[in-house]
């Protein structure tokens, strides 16, 4: 009996020892594997990145950018793309920003900083297009990259770029202003690659592409006459004529792609006001007065996060009371509209495609809901909450 128990106990202890040995070996191998994975991740993170920007130039970064300077944060810059790619971490990545978001999109700025208070702590570095860009300050911030809208390339290369090149700060050009699908796609890709967020950038690009092509594919099949359209930025109020557009820039390019015939296409190079008589002579089918929040201009068209529907209706109505406008087709036929001026030249301007197409061809786009698309974009990509009034048809 004693011998049997002894043999049993011996086997039991041998099994326990073997089990412990196997567990130890497994832990060691796992630890080694983890260390190897960690080294692999670190090596990947520190691996040089080659980016092709919208100009076709190749830019090499030593690693994914962790310190970034941006321009034209109000529209057409990298700010919203970075926010969509990196979420709340965007305030840690941007080390220098221009003042246009707070200056020209006050409603958006107020709303964004309420959701993300760290935005206010990002150093202001001026704007290239306003000749206030502080090159020395930017160099002292030691950014890994600066994203520059293509539209300011000439001035940037004349006034700023040589000094940044000398300091070893790479420049990546992006372009949302031309409203070309390929340029939007390449800009998203370039920013995503620079930040090491290629997978997220692919999602963003796909969302944008799907919504835009759904509109343009349908527009290409419409054979009816194009409505004539006058678009003006209502920043100055009814008393002064604001910016209108050519057919290759911002609202003008968008309207053209969406099947509108821009009446200012041959009289403006990119953007600028026209003579009041010109609009009366052209007598457009549709008038669009674009709004935002310009608090220093109380009669300006107001839309966005801080807009009141009834008050904005009255502001829009005031534009139709300009001299001679009561005789215009668009006014008589109740074809006067507004949309937020912060929507074009951006990663979410696919909603502008939807809104313009539905405005110009309501029957063909009856199933499209641009406001629902904008809300979906905010909820899916941006670290900011959705709200406000972004589109309006004059009652």
Please provide the spans of the model-predicted regions.
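Bacterial N-terminal signal peptides that target proteins for export
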Residues: 3-19
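Hydrophobic alpha-helical transmembrane signal-anchor segments
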Residues: 22-24
């Amino acid at each position: 009996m004693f011998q049997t128990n002894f043999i049993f106990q011996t086997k039991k202890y041998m099994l326990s020892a073997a089990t412990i040995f196997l567990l130890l070996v497994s832990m060691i191998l796992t630890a080694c594997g983890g260390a190897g994975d960690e080294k692999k991740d670190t090596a990947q993170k520190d691996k040089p990145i080659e980016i092709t920007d919208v100009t076709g130039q190749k830019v090499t970064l030593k690693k994914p950018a962790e310190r970034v300077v941006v321009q034209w944060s109000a529209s057409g810059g990298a700010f919203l793309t970075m926010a969509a790619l990196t979420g709340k971490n965007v305030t840690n990545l941007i080390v220098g920003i221009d003042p246009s978001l707070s200056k020209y999109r006050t409603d958006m700025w107020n709303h964004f900083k309420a959701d993300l208070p760290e935005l206010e702590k990002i150093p202001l570095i001026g704007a290239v297009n306003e000749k206030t860009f502080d090159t020395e300050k930017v160099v002292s911030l030691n950014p890994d990259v600066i994203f520059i809208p293509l539209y300011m390339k000439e001035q940037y290369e004349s006034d700023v770029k040589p000094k940044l090149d000398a300091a070893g700060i790479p420049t990546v050009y992006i372009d949302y202003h031309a409203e070309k699908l390929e340029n939007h796609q390449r800009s998203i890709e370039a920013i995503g690659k620079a930040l090491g967020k290629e997978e997220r950038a692919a999602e963003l690009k796909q969302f944008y592409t799907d919504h835009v092509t759904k509109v343009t594919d349908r527009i290409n099949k419409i054979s009816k006459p194009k409505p004539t359209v006058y678009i003006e930025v209502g920043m100055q109020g009814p008393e002064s004529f604001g910016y209108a557009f050519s057919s290759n820039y911002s609202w003008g390019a968008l309207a053209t792609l969406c099947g509108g015939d821009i009446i200012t296409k041959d009289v403006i190079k990119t953007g600028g006001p026209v003579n009041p008589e010109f609009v009366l002579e052209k007598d457009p089918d549709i008038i669009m007065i674009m709004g935002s929040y310009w608090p220093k201009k109380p009669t300006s068209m107001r839309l966005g996060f801080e807009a009141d529907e009834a008050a904005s209706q009255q502001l829009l109505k005031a534009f139709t009371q300009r001299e001679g406008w009561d005789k215009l087709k668009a006014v008589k036929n109740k074809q006067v509209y507004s949309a937020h001026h912060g929507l074009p030249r951006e990663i979410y301007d696919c909603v502008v495609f939807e809104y313009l197409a539905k405005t110009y061809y309501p029957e063909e786009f009856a199933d499209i809901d641009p406001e629902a698309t904008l809300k979906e974009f905010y909820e899916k990509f941006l670290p900011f909450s959705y709200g406000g009034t972004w589109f309006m048809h004059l009652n």
